[in-house]
Amino acid sequence: MGLERVVVIGLGVSGRSIARFLAQKGVCVLGVDKSLHALQNCPYIQEKYLENEEFPSQVDYVVRSPGVSKEHPWVQAAIASHIPVMTDIQLAFQTEKFTERESLAITGTTGKTTTILFLEYLFKRSGIPAFAMGNVGIPILDGMQNPGVRIVEISSFQLADQEKSYPVLSGGMILNISDNHLDYHGNFSEYFQAKQNLALCMRNPDDLWVGDERFYGHLYLEEVQKYMRLLDKESALKPLYLHDKHNYCCAYLLAKIEFPISETSFIEAVATFNKPPHRMEYLGQKQGIHYINDSKATTVSATETALLGVGNQAIVILGGRNKGCTFSSLLPALRKAAKSVVAMGECAQEIARDLEEFPVTVVKNLSEALLCAEEQAVPGDVIVLSPACASFDQFRSYEERGAMFKHLVGMEEVLL
């Protein structure tokens, strides 16, 4: 590999991980980014290019960071020149290390991170070394060096290029599929196909399981329902949202492919697991009004799921940057769960048009949205931030948006 010349497109967290991995293998790394600062601060690249420069010659293959679109001009230039294009997932799956021990992967539209982290927690609590990596935060090329079971969160961005078969996974789960990232994939068919590409990574195709009966009724696991009923019988458990129960049960089924973890251990793990923040995070109540931070709900389907767990007196804060979805599909869930909507941000007017049959107030930003919601609320109501949109119109991330909501609510103070 020492003579290979490899282009890495995008030098964020994943891109730097890719460049570091390749440099350690003796590859000549050519880095490309829209930011000169990113290029200057990546010590692993031998040649630096801004993305508006011409595609270089004598390139063996291209590795794009997960967030870099297949329509990127350098990706298109590589394809036109019949140069292979891949992501860090394919690069990792080609290494011998990935066949040395058990590796599990989860993809889906919503719930991936919570499910991955619960699965890691379940393993560790059962005395089984495990390490979560991939889209969950630790790039796969860094995380695969850790001991124990590999648990990989894979996004549709990373699966979109999956054309070859890399049979390295001992188990896989497609949690669910609904409209998402259509601004990236172009249409639902392309997004749907990207998720299904996980099948190309399985050692045994029978160990790819599906948690969504809408698209895979014949493959849907009856065991999911069985273990959800098991959790329902456990009166000692704290109340669980329906989607959380579903995700925990999917994780348990995936764990049991290789390890005989008991139902008792599973129930104890559910009882003691703390979800990551910004996912139907109950903040408390003030003057009888309850507050929920669901900033992670960046899709219409995620908000639909959230509305299943908020009763029927919710004031829902929607808005941000649309990811290519329509909001009218929220109407059935809103009619059951909400009394009104406050629409904010870049696509607030679009939300108001799509939901014209429902009470909607349009505001500029999150601060105004919370103030408007509180003016409408009475004791017993729930104000829930579940935007159904990306955050990038006004925030750097959904985490920043959620943190701002918590600050505005006054979570730092005693709310109960």
Curated annotation (Swiss-Prot):
Pathway where it operates: Cell wall biogenesis; peptidoglycan biosynthesis
An annotated GO cellular component: cytoplasm
Entry keyword set: ATP-binding, Cell cycle, Cell division, Cell shape, Cell wall biogenesis/degradation, Cytoplasm, Ligase, Nucleotide-binding, Peptidoglycan synthesis
EC number: 6.3.2.9
Subcellular location: Cytoplasm
One BP term from GO: peptidoglycan biosynthetic process
Catalytic activity: UDP-N-acetyl-alpha-D-muramoyl-L-alanine + D-glutamate + ATP = UDP-N-acetyl-alpha-D-muramoyl-L-alanyl-D-glutamate + ADP + phosphate + H(+)
Annotated ATP binding sites: 108-114
Gene Ontology MF term list: ATP binding; UDP-N-acetylmuramoylalanine-D-glutamate ligase activity
Location (main, coarse): cytoplasm
The protein's role, per its UniProt record: Cell wall formation. Catalyzes the addition of glutamate to the nucleotide precursor UDP-N-acetylmuramoyl-L-alanine (UMA).
Similarity comment: Belongs to the MurCDEF family.
NCBIfam families, A to Z: murD
UniProt-recorded name of the protein: UDP-N-acetylmuramoylalanine--D-glutamate ligase
Species per Swiss-Prot/TrEMBL record: Chlamydia trachomatis serovar L2b (strain UCH-1/proctitis)
Lineage, top ranks: Bacteria, Pseudomonadati, Chlamydiota, Chlamydiia, Chlamydiales
Designated gene of the protein: murD
